[in-house]
A protein has these predicted regions:
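Periplasmic-binding protein-like
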Residues: 70, 147-156, 227, 235-272, ...
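Bilobed "Venus flytrap"/periplasmic-binding protein-like clamshell domains
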Residues: 68-73, 85-98, 130, 151-207, ...
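Acidic, polar ligand-binding/catalytic clefts
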Residues: 94, 103-167
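Extended ligand-binding regions for polar small-molecule ligands
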Residues: 90-99, 158, 166-172, 177-179, ...
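Extracytoplasmic small-molecule ligand-binding "clamshell" domains
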Residues: 47-129
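A ligand-binding cleft/hinge motif common to bilobed small-molecule-binding domains
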Residues: 112-113, 130-138, 185-188, 216-249
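C-terminal motif of bacterial Sec signal peptides marking the signal peptidase cleavage site
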Residues: 27-32
């Protein structure tokens, strides 16, 4: 498989990049204000009286330290004007922390190492659009909070008629490192070569925002990511992008906790249930214009993922 690596410093800003950036900024300004600083400080007010018992073992007393790859709108991204993390996931975990009488500090993480960093106690928990799968469950436990599938983002009109990953043989495609989408593209590429076709020409980048920029700059013909991300960029750029084919591989995403940290797991589960029952969860879906089918219900059999 062909893999092309790029660094941020090697790329020059384009009109397309500025257009996407302006629209993202506009969307954030229209959304309700709030968020947590990506690098550390939390400008949120003092938490109210706890309604959920807080965990007993925190990295910093009084603070829930949260790892998140803040390059994945609409779930987690950074407001360029304030440097604060924002998005559905950020709002949710901040409200959950407040229900435990804690402040939330969001630490920008590398998605490719985020699980190992949690195990190494760099964070108390991780919320970062993590699909729950068997490989990750070997290292951490999950409290599901969201459901998402995978989809292709292509140029408006879908000029190459791309419907599934099997249509990508020999084509340039962008994807974020460490994701289930990368795994699926690797599998599809092997199927291409087994059928006597060219491998998929993958450009694998660390940040999802940079992956989308590849499509803006016409360096790839498609990108592959979680369906909410695809939907988000289509909404931000009317007439520029569309979904290629259907959403596939719908699966739960979870807030991850170190194995054996029963106090943290129970607190996160109880706090999420609180958000689900008091209307906060539903209000955040409305705020971020998410699809109701992506909700995880209190009665969902996937409420706990441990092994």
């Amino acid at each position: 498989m062909e893999a092309i690596s790029h660094t941020k410093g090697s790329r020059r800003a384009s009109k397309g990049m500025l257009f996407v950036g302006m629209l993202i900024l506009l969307a954030m300004l229209l959304a309700a204000c709030g968020g947590t600083t990506a690098g550390g400080t939390t400008p949120t007010p003092n938490p109210a009286t706890p309604t959920v018992a807080p965990p007993t073992d925190l990295i910093t007393p009084g603070t829930l330290t949260v790892g998140s790859d803040t390059t994945y709108p609409p779930q987690e991204f950074v407001d360029p004007t304030t440097g604060q993390a924002t998005g559905f996931d950020i709002d949710l975990i901040t409200a959950m922390a407040q229900s435990m009488g804690l402040k939330a500090t969001i630490v920008k993480a590398n998605f490719n190492t985020i699980v190992d960093d949690l195990v190494a106690k760099r964070y108390d928990v991780v919320i970062s659009a993590q699909t729950i799968n068997d490989e990750r469950k070997k290292k951490v436990d999950f409290v599901p909070y969201f459901s998402a599938g995978e989809s292709l983002l292509v140029a408006q009109g879908n000029p190459m008629n791309l419907k599934t990953v099997s249509d990508l043989c020999g084509l340039a495609v962008g994807v974020q490192d460490g994701t289930v989408e990368l795994d699926d593209l690797n599998t599809a590429s092997k199927a291409c070569t087994a059928a006597g076709k060219q491998a998929i020409k993958l450009t694998i980048l660390k940040d999802q925002t940079d992956v989308i920029q590849l499509l803006v700059n016409k360096r790839v013909v498609a990108t592959y990511q979680d369906s909410p991300v695809t939907d988000y960029y289509i909404k931000l750029n009317p007439g520029q992008f569309e979904t290629g084919g259907s959403v596939v591989n719908a699966a739960a995403e979870g807030i991850s906790v170190r194995k054996g940290d029963t106090s943290m797991f129970n607190a996160i589960q109880a706090a999420f249930q609180r958000m689900r029952s008091n209307g906060t969860y539903d209000s955040l879906f409305t705020k971020w214009q998410l699809n109701a089918s992506q909700k995880i219900s209190l009665g969902d059999r996937r409420t706990i993922y441990t092994s």
